[in-house]
From Swiss-Prot:
Gene assigned in the entry: Olr1174
UniProt organism field: Rattus norvegicus (Rat)
Glycosylation sites: 5, 167
InterPro entries with a match to the protein in the record: GPCR_Rhodpsn, GPCR_Rhodpsn_7TM, Olfact_rcpt
Transmembrane segments: 26-46, 58-78, 107-127, 143-163, 197-217, 245-265, 271-291
Record membrane topology: Multi-pass membrane protein
One cellular-component annotation, GO: plasma membrane
UniProt keyword terms in alphabetical order: Cell membrane, Disulfide bond, G-protein coupled receptor, Glycoprotein, Membrane, Olfaction, Receptor, Sensory transduction, Transducer, Transmembrane, Transmembrane helix
UniProt protein name: Olfactory receptor 1174
Lineage: Eukaryota, Metazoa, Chordata, Craniata, Vertebrata
Length: 331
C-alpha cells in the first residue's frame, strides 16, 4: 500500500455506533438529549457553587472543576459524532483528529486527578477535621488544580507532537467513533513504538497513582468510621463522601469492567461501548449523583432557581420550604 506523509492526509474516516441505518435517527436523538442534559446538569452545578457563598470551600471547588471538565470532556467527542450521524461520509479532518486527541487526553487526565483530590479532601474532612482548614487551604487547592492543568496540557501536547510525525494511508478508517489515541496509532503506517511506550507509561501512571490514592484515602475513611461509636456520626461522615464514592465507582467501574475483562482480544464494539460509558454516561450522571445525595447542593440549586426562574409565588413557597427543611436537617 502506498504510504503518504501526514502533511498530505486531509481526513480520516470514523465508524458508526450502529451499521443499521434505521437506528441512526434514534441514536441521534438519544445522544443529543444526553449531551444537552449533561451540559445543563453540570452548568447548574457550577452556577450553584459559584453563586452560594456557603459552598466556597475546597470540596465544592473540586466539584465545580469536575463539572467544567465533564462539560469539556463530552464536548470533545459527542458533537462530531452527532454531525457524522447526519453525514454520509463519516469523516474527520486531520486537524480535527489531532484536536480531539489533545483535548480528550487532557480532560480524561483531569478527571482522574480531580477524583483523587476529592477523595483526599474527604479523607482530611473525616480523619483530620481539626486540621482541615490548614491542610485544604483554598490557595493550595487552587495552585494544585492549576498545576495539574498545566501538566495535562503538556502531556497531551507531547502525544500530539509524536502523532504528528506519523504516516497514514489515504482513506484510513479509524475503528472508533472518535479519534482515540490508541486506535489512531493502530492504523498508522509508521513505527509507533515510541508513541506506544509513552502512551502506556503515562496511562499506567495516570491510572495506578490516582486509583492508589483513592483506595488509600477510603481505607483510612473506613477505618475511622469503624472507630466511631455514634451511628449519627457515621451517617454524617459517610454522607460527606457518598456522592464522590458513587462517581468513582461509575467512572473506574466502566473502564475496569470492559477494558480489563477476561477477553484477550477486545472487539471494536466493546471498545466503543467502554468509551461511551466514561465519555458520555459518567459526565451525564455526575450532576444527578451529587445533587440527589447532597443537601447543600440541593439548597443552592433551589436558591438559584428562585433568583433566576420567574415562577408563581406558590412554587417559590414550596422551594423555600424545601430549602428551610434541608437547612434545619443540616444543623
Amino acid at each position: 500500500m502506498k504510504m503518504e506523509n501526514h502533511t498530505l492526509i486531509s481526513e480520516f474516516f470514523l465508524l458508526d455506533l450502529s451499521d443499521d441505518p434505521k437506528l441512526q435517527p434514534f441514536l441521534f436523538g438519544l445522544f443529543l438529549s444526553m449531551y444537552l442534559v449533561t451540559m445543563l446538569g453540570n452548568l447548574l452545578i457550577i452556577l450553584a457553587v459559584s453563586s452560594n457563598s456557603q459552598l466556597h470551600n475546597p470540596m465544592y471547588f473540586f466539584l465545580s472543576n469536575l463539572s467544567f471538565v465533564d462539560i469539556c470532556f463530552i464536548s470533545t467527542t459527542v458533537p462530531k459524532m452527532l454531525v457524522n450521524m447526519q453525514s454520509q461520509t463519516k469523516d474527520i479532518s486531520y486537524i480535527e483528529c489531532l484536536t480531539q486527541v489533545y483535548f480528550f487526553n487532557t480532560f480524561v487526565g483531569m478527571d482522574d486527578v480531580l477524583l483523587t483530590l476529592m477523595a483526599y479532601d474527604c479523607f482530611v474532612a473525616i480523619c483530620n477535621p481539626l486540621k482541615y482548614t490548614i491542610i485544604m487551604n483554598p490557595r493550595v487547592c487552587t495552585l494544585l488544580v492549576l498545576m495539574f492543568w498545566i501538566i495535562m496540557f503538556c502531556i497531551s501536547l507531547i502525544h500530539v507532537l509524536l502523532m504528528n510525525e506519523l504516516n497514514f494511508s489515504r482513506g484510513t478508517k479509524i475503528p472508533h467513533f472518535f479519534c482515540e489515541l490508541a486506535q489512531v496509532l493502530k492504523v498508522s503506517n509508521s513505527d509507533t513504538h515510541i508513541n506506544n511506550i509513552f502512551m502506556y507509561v503515562l496511562s499506567s501512571l495516570l491510572g495506578v497513582i490516582p486509583m492508589t490514592g483513592i483506595l488509600m484515602s477510603y481505607s483510612q475513611i473506613v477505618s475511622s468510621l469503624l472507630r466511631m461509636s455514634s451511628t449519627v456520626s457515621k451517617y454524617k461522615a459517610f454522607s460527606t463522601c457518598g456522592s464522590h464514592l458513587c462517581v468513582v465507582c461509575l467512572f473506574y467501574g466502566s473502564v475496569i469492567g470492559v477494558y480489563f475483562s477476561s477477553s484477550v482480544v477486545l472487539s471494536t464494539q466493546r471498545i466503543m461501548v467502554a468509551s461511551l460509558m466514561y465519555t458520555v454516561i459518567s459526565p451525564m450522571l455526575n450532576p444527578f449523583i451529587y445533587s440527589l445525595r447532597n443537601k447543600d447542593v440541593k439548597v443552592a440549586l433551589g436558591e438559584l432557581f428562585i433568583r433566576v426562574a420567574p415562577c408563581p409565588s406558590w412554587i417559590n413557597d414550596i422551594i423555600t420550604k424545601f430549602i428551610l427543611k434541608n437547612i434545619r436537617q443540616n444543623l
